[in-house]
């Protein structure tokens, strides 16, 4: 029998959650991570599945995700413990044929359930599937320290925040030319914040929740993690710069335009115009 804990997707989730914990982005049970799979990914592991998979209805139907498997982190689970007991902290779920709910095929032992942010994840997956023609498969939410800090001191405006991050590190415009979407503060774990996040995910692969954290999307676990890591590094630089009295020189608009041309990306126009 093939052991699902040795599969590429379980091992990938272990690495991503462990790395995020070590970064300091996921204290206690903070953060959540979902990866969209294909049936072929789980085909070898049916012997590992629960004999009677639990069914959980969704608060709103997701027909675009019908019959789609995911691996997800659990509600109330600590990222630091995923590596110690993957089956207790992760779960493979599969959305049913009409998108009204899902079965827990593997993991989430002892009656555990997926992350409370699953509505936000699933709604964001739907939008990123449409925005990237199915390329994006990962939604990651974490409490990246310096990005959160900046939401207290910068105007919480997409163009302003994006431009500052682009200026904080040269690679940022290349990595996220589509900029950073920003929500107003909202209660987490609700359909409302999920819908608002998904709306921003139509236009941006990064979405900030002020005073809380960040959502990132990407085609692989490495890409989604790297996207957040890049933005967080720029935020760390900016926190240091602001604490030293602010910028005396920075990357100019003309230089940002040249950077976009060199790497074949189209920068977010509203951020470039500032």
From Swiss-Prot:
Pathway field: Carbohydrate degradation; L-rhamnose degradation; glycerone phosphate from L-rhamnose: step 3/3
Membrane-spanning parts: none
Alphabetical UniProt keywords: Cytoplasm, Lyase, Metal-binding, Rhamnose metabolism, Zinc
Cofactor note: Binds 1 zinc ion per subunit.
Active site: 117
Reactions accelerated catalytically: L-rhamnulose 1-phosphate = (S)-lactaldehyde + dihydroxyacetone phosphate
Cellular component aspect of the GO annotation: cytosol
Similarity-based family: Belongs to the aldolase class II family. RhaD subfamily.
Name of the protein this chain belongs to: Rhamnulose-1-phosphate aldolase
Annotated source species: Shigella flexneri
């Amino acid at each position: 029998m093939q052991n699902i804990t040795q599969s590429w997707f379980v091992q990938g989730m272990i690495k991503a959650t462990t790395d995020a914990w070590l970064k300091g982005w996921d204290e206690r049970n903070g953060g959540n991570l979902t990866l969209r799979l294909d049936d072929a990914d789980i085909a070898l592991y049916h012997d590992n599945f629960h004999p009677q998979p639990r069914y959980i209805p969704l608060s709103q139907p997701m027909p675009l995700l019908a019959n789609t498997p995911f691996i997800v982190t659990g509600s109330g689970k600590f990222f630091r413990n995923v590596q110690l007991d993957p089956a207790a902290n992760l779960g493979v779920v599969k959305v049913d044929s009409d998108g009204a709910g899902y079965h827990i095929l593997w993991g989430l032992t002892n009656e555990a359930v997926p992350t409370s942010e699953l509505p936000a994840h699933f709604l964001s997956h739907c939008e990123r599937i449409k925005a990237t023609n199915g390329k994006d498969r990962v939604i990651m939410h974490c409490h990246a320290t310096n990005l959160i800090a900046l939401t207290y001191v910068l105007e919480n405006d997409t163009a302003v925040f994006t431009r500052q991050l682009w200026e904080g590190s040269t690679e940022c415009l290349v990595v996220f030319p589509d900029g950073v979407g920003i929500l107003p503060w909202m209660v987490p774990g609700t359909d409302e914040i999920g819908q608002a996040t998904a709306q921003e995910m139509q236009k941006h692969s990064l979405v900030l929740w002020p005073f809380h954290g960040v959502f990132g999307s990407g085609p692989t676990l490495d890409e989604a993690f790297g996207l957040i890591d890049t933005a967080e590094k720029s935020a760390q630089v900016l926190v240091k710069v602001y604490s030293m009295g602010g910028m005396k020189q920075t990357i100019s608009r003309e230089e940002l335009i040249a950077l976009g041309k060199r790497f074949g990306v189209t920068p977010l126009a509203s951020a470039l115009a500032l």
